Amino acid sequence: MTGVFDRRVPSIRSGDFQAPFPTSAAMHHPSQESPTLPESSATDSDYYSPAGAAPHGYCSPTSASYGKALNPYQYQYHSVNGSAAGYPAKAYADYGYASPYHQYGGAYNRVPSATSQPEKEVAEPEVRMVNGKPKKVRKPRTIYSSFQLAALQRRFQKTQYLALPERAELAASLGLTQTQVKIWFQNKRSKIKKIMKNGEMPPEHSPSSSDPMACNSPQSPAVWEPQGSSRSLSHHPHAHPPTSNQSPASSYLENSASWYPSAASSINSHLPPPGSLQHPLALASGTLY
């Protein structure tokens, strides 16, 4: 074996591996040049002496290709049976990898701004610039018909606050939305509170939810009250105060007869005696008091 190694080393130094990239036949199959060595020996195709040539892919400083970038696609790959299969070198531009990654970074950063643009377009109609200041555009006012206003007013006199089912039922019957009914009731309540605060309407005459039959008009005096009739006659300039023995009806007829003297005789002829009129009025006053 020592003689074989001695013969092997001079054959490697003979200048077969002087090229920076040796051929596959000289580097991987040296057993064909020395028929004395068996093919299955441990020194086959991968033995290099320290003084010999550089291994595959190594560039010495003295070579012409030293310092240059090596193309990884120029290497030769061996198949199963040991034959070298050369693949042509491809540039990066053929595969579309010539452009660096940072060129795509700008487009990636612009994606969120493009998605947020429709949101700004949707929100723009709600805000309008007036004299350089943003102003929110108000929705148009709802115009209620006379029928709707009458129905809402009747319901407000019954109760000032509506529950959800009641509001939904009222809105469906009037052809309005629940929001419109709610806003109308809110405006009506605020208007009533403002009137009460200014003193135009006393609190006792304002409609309340506890008393649905409340009436805002003052009570009218009864017709059969003697005091009310005497008050009404006292305001008249030509009226005379009633005497104790005359009824209010007879005194009123006498006053009217003084205005029309021609009809005084006919009125006095049809008048009953004063005592007959005082008797039923006394009975009526006794029943009231």
From Swiss-Prot:
A biological process term (GO) from this entry: cellular response to zinc ion starvation
PTM comment, free text: Phosphorylated. Phosphorylation of Ser-34 and Ser-217 by MAPK14 enhances its transcriptional activity. Phosphorylation by CaMK2 increases its protein stability.
Residue ranges flagged as DNA-binding region: 137-196
Biased composition (Polar residues): 32-46, 206-220, 242-253
Chief place of localization: nucleus
Region described as Disordered: 1-49, 198-253, 270-289
Gene from which this protein is expressed: Dlx5
Quaternary organization: Interacts with XRCC6 (Ku70).
UniProt superkingdom: Eukaryota
Family: Belongs to the distal-less homeobox family.
Protein name per Swiss-Prot or TrEMBL: Homeobox protein DLX-5
Alphabetically ordered keywords of this record: Activator, Developmental protein, DNA-binding, Homeobox, Nucleus, Osteogenesis, Phosphoprotein, Transcription, Transcription regulation
Functional summary from the UniProt entry: Transcriptional factor involved in bone development. Acts as an immediate early BMP-responsive transcriptional activator essential for osteoblast differentiation. Stimulates ALPL promoter activity in a RUNX2-independent manner during osteoblast differentiation. Stimulates SP7 promoter activity during osteoblast differentiation. Promotes cell proliferation by up-regulating MYC promoter activity. Involved as a positive regulator of both chondrogenesis and chondrocyte hypertrophy in the endochondral skeleton. Binds to the homeodomain-response element of the ALPL and SP7 promoter.
GO CC annotations, alphabetized: chromatin; cytoplasm; nucleus
